[in-house]
């Protein structure tokens, strides 16, 4: 029987939401405005795809969701901080995210910047909290390095810089690949590997999961590019057509829609092949890959 990926994602997203509610500061704790801004963006919706990837990565090597929940929450906080900052006028200048006004439209630019900063730093506190859960210290060191590299100048932030510097320019496939593998795929790859590390994955398993995660992350961003062209703002929960309006470097702009779709599906097929040795334990990762290329928003 094939996995019901929607139910799988919904069940784990609910668990992640409950954990996030526990770990985030209360809105009644000072500074109240900052904590309201942090919680506003974290709980503004979203698929919780990255924390679900953390959990699926652990499950692929026999781990359990409860042992990786702090790491799953940390990854979601890093992702949310990046969205808050991406939406600022100095960057993508977007008014809506996940169907609601962006953080800076509600709280102002200064508080939005600080809310992002606070989420990023809290994320690393949560990663360290895995010590209290009795996890292996060597694995935690490796996870800290993995996620810091994926989130920083060697990963997500570096990809964002390349994205900004490419606006309005004619760029080739190599530049688009660099942007997407760093800005998006790096954190998805790290999410899967981090979950597996906490669950005691072997070096060879981490190599295979890294290959699968990189391909799934790139496929996800290619589909984001496609949906920016084909979906409505209501379906996306954010302004559609922004990539073309801002002359961003995207897969459809360089390769066209059809070639982009074919490439995304090929990447998912390669990810499935990399997961073959994991057997049924990796079925959630396979199903998430299929979801990535079939989603409509």
PLM features: residue spans?
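Mg2+-dependent prenyl diphosphate-binding active-site environment of isoprenoid biosynthetic enzymes
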Residues: 15, 24, 28-274, 280-293
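N-terminal amphipathic/basic leader segments beginning at the initiator methionine
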Residues: 1-25
């Amino acid at each position: 029987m094939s996995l019901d990926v929607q139910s799988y994602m919904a069940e784990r997203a609910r668990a992640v939401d409950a954990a996030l509610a526990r770990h985030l500061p209360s809105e009644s704790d000072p500074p109240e405005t900052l904590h309201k801004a942090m919680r506003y963006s974290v709980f503004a919706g979203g698929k919780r795809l990255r924390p679900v990837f953390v959990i699926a990565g652990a499950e692929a090597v026999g781990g359990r969701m409860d042992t990786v929940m702090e790491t799953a929450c940390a990854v979601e906080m890093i992702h949310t901080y990046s969205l808050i900052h991406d939406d600022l006028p100095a960057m993508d200048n977007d008014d809506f995210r996940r169907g609601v006004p962006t953080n800076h439209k509600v709280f102002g630019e200064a508080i939005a910047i600080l809310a992002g900063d606070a989420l990023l730093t809290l994320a690393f506190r949560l990663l360290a909290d895995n010590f209290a859960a009795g996890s292996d210290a060597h694995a935690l060191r490796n996870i800290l390095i993995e996620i810091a590299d994926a989130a920083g100048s060697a990963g997500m932030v570096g990809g964002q810089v390349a994205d900004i510097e490419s606006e309005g320019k004619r760029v080739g496939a190599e530049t688009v690949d660099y942007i997407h593998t760093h800005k998006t795929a790096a954190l998805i790859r790290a999410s899967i590997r981090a979950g597996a590390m906490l669950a005691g994955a072997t070096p060879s398993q981490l190599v295979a999961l890294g290959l699968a995660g990189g391909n799934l992350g790139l496929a996800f961003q290619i589909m984001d590019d496609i949906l920016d062209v084909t979906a409505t703002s209501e379906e996306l929960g954010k302004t559609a057509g922004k990539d073309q309006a801002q002359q961003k470097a995207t897969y459809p702009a360089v390769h066209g829609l059809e070639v982009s779709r074919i490439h995304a599906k090929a990447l998912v097929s390669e990810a499935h092949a990399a997961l073959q040795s994991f057997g049924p334990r990796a079925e959630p990762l396979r199903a998430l890959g299929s979801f990535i290329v079939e989603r409509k928003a």
